[in-house]
Amino acid sequence: MNSETNSLSTRRHALLLATVQEFIATAEPVGSQQVAAHYSLGVRSAMVRSMMAELEESGFLTQPHVSAGRIPTDKAFRYYVDHLLVSSRIAFEDRAQIELHYSGRSRGLDDVMRDTPKLLALLTGQAALVMAPRLEAMTIERVSFVRLRERQVLGMFVATADRVENRLVETDRDFKQDELDRIAGYLNESLAGRTLDEARRWIERELKEQRAAYDQFRRDALALGGGAIGEKGDRTEVYIEGRVKALDQPEFTDPERVRELLRALDDKSALLALLERSIQQNGLMVSIGSENYDPRLACLSVIAASYATGSESVGSLAVVGPVRMDYDRVIPLVGYTARTLTRLLEH
């Protein structure tokens, strides 16, 4: 919180929070009589009107026209969210729904990733995104090879949460299966417990230092290991649900604006960049309206949280909706879901 937003008097603080809450509930400009009637501020309507004018001068509120009530700005929502983050707790019903969704199910990682945005979209009524674990950050558990035909081998590795990756490796010579098994054993001793990125660097370092120059077995092992792991690249999946739900709001009545927002929510590279920000922050991130890097999302808010394996953040999830979002409910819900995914990956 900056000093300006942190220095509101007690009454103005209470009034601003009440105005934001009323706007979230109604999607209509908020009048002084409306706030005075619905919230116990301890002042009369005339005083409320005067304080709202001061909040407008400070950039927290705006007035569509003279006779209308006032609408909170992005600055007001930022103030509201910064104060919420101190005390928000997940609703009991939301926590129970999340626990029920994930409990007692034996599912693969891909199924969990596909189902999670469906759950978030259902609970929040907004768009929900999940970035699957970044392969580069996942830990290798074991490597294996299967001879397919002459000079062709299937390289496989199992990573965190039983994620399995296969690569077809063309070889310079033919291998028998027992040779491949010995090579897999050697690589497992060296690579198990390393992330994919660390394993790739280890292979590159071994080749560079030419330790395998006069050792055919090690030379073959490094070649096959490198082939199984593959080159570094963008293999991250993003799953999204509820695009239409997020835009089925009073704010979004202009068809062209809706089309632009739908295009933004279909842009994988933009979504990845958005989700990467929460990984870099290593925790919860709330980006409100004009704070979003993508100008197409300037009328939306993003609530995102990263999930981890061990101490490494490997993916993230987010709820995207109008700036007039129910932050009090959605922020703890997103955070709890991310922590639940972390627990699932660890077990």
Residue ranges and their predicted role:
Residues 18-21, 25, 29-85:
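N-terminal helix-turn-helix
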Residues 7-8, 43, 72, 90:
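Alpha-helical hairpin
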Residues 1-17:
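Short alpha-helical segments that sit at the start of domains
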Residues 2-4, 61-66, 324:
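A short glycine/serine-rich beta->alpha loop
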